[in-house]
């Protein structure tokens, strides 16, 4: 069966037996198979799981204590070493606190991108280098191709599982050290390979939830930052008060359910104002836009965005199939995106990821 899972050498001019690969193991199917496959192919695998938070439920998330046990069991079955690193402090300070701060600013965060950006691909990558390993490997569904000293990043062959959206903030320097061996395969075949290796996680469900949110965002924020929950007014687009809310952290742009108001026509959250603590609601027509602004751009291409604009495809959320757009550069690492032939809900705090076909060019944060 291994003949169906051929991968190119992960390090140029170096055999698998001479290559030390640290594999970031979340305890799920994908990273477990990535580690097991490389071990079978002769790589010197070291499995590392990050302890990020205190959660023993293991329900629909990742990197909890039960997931650490699963990762250790996989390593034991396959016969390669496994270690757990405690990153709870940095995860709390740079991911969880940022998650709460972003909601308090009236934006909708994506903590998984932040975790990749600062914990996995900064701190874990540095730890990998300190072990004198050659590469850091993950189970993400994304493709990376190196050619003539250039790095090209593409969406996964399995478009339903593609995770390029969540990795847009990964820098070229980080990508030089990272490897994604599952990018050319489909998830169904990865599960079959897990069964072939007799791994106990072969039928483990995919993680769906934000790992540190045990039940709801509101309860998590209220527990960690009680002063973030402040009552305020719900107003219409003309400024008329329609009712009250229990905190803007309970809302996101485009939200329809849970507003707490009755109306003949559906009402949507149009705007969140943290300065006045007001939630503006209105009809769907007031929600759709064809222009947005992005900041803190991570650009993976040598050529800069031309001032005349660049024709691209953009994804405004992970499940978004993509919209054609023109991107115009601005000062201070910002850009303006004009959607072509479509209007979308634009949610500050989310990512706008930019593609040329299936090649990821980079992206930025919607502001």
UniProtKB/Swiss-Prot annotation:
Give the matching PANTHER family: MITOCHONDRIAL TRNA-SPECIFIC 2-THIOURIDYLASE 1, TRNA 5-METHYLAMINOMETHYL-2-THIOURIDYLATE -METHYLTRANSFERASE
What this chain does, per the entry, is described as: Catalyzes the 2-thiolation of uridine at the wobble position (U34) of tRNA, leading to the formation of s(2)U34.
Which reaction is catalysed here?
A: S-sulfanyl-L-cysteinyl-[protein] + uridine(34) in tRNA + AH2 + ATP = 2-thiouridine(34) in tRNA + L-cysteinyl-[protein] + A + AMP + diphosphate + H(+)
User: Per its UniProt record, what CDD domains does this chain match?
Assistant: MnmA_TRMU-like (cd01998)
Which residues form each disulfide bond in the chain?
Answer: 115-211
Q: Name one Pfam family in it.
A: tRNA_Me_trans
| Entry EC no(s) | 2.8.1.13
- Which HAMAP family does the annotation name? tRNA_thiouridyl_MnmA
SUPFAM superfamilies reported in the protein's UniProt record: Adenine nucleotide alpha hydrolases-like (SSF52402)
Q: Which GO terms describe its molecular function?
A: ATP binding; tRNA binding; tRNA-uridine 2-sulfurtransferase activity
At the top level, the lineage of the source is: Bacteria
Name of protein:
tRNA-specific 2-thiouridylase MnmA
Site (Interaction with tRNA) at: 140, 350
Q: InterPro entries annotated for this entry?
A: MnmA-like, MnmA-like_C, MnmA-like_central, MnmA-like_central_sf, Rossmann-like_a/b/a_fold
Where does this protein come from, organism-wise? Ehrlichia chaffeensis (strain ATCC CRL-10679 / Arkansas)
Pull one GO CC term from this UniProt entry. Answer: cytoplasm
List the gene name: mnmA
Positions binding ATP in this chain are 24-31, 50, 139
State the NCBIfam families in the record: PRK00143.1, trmU
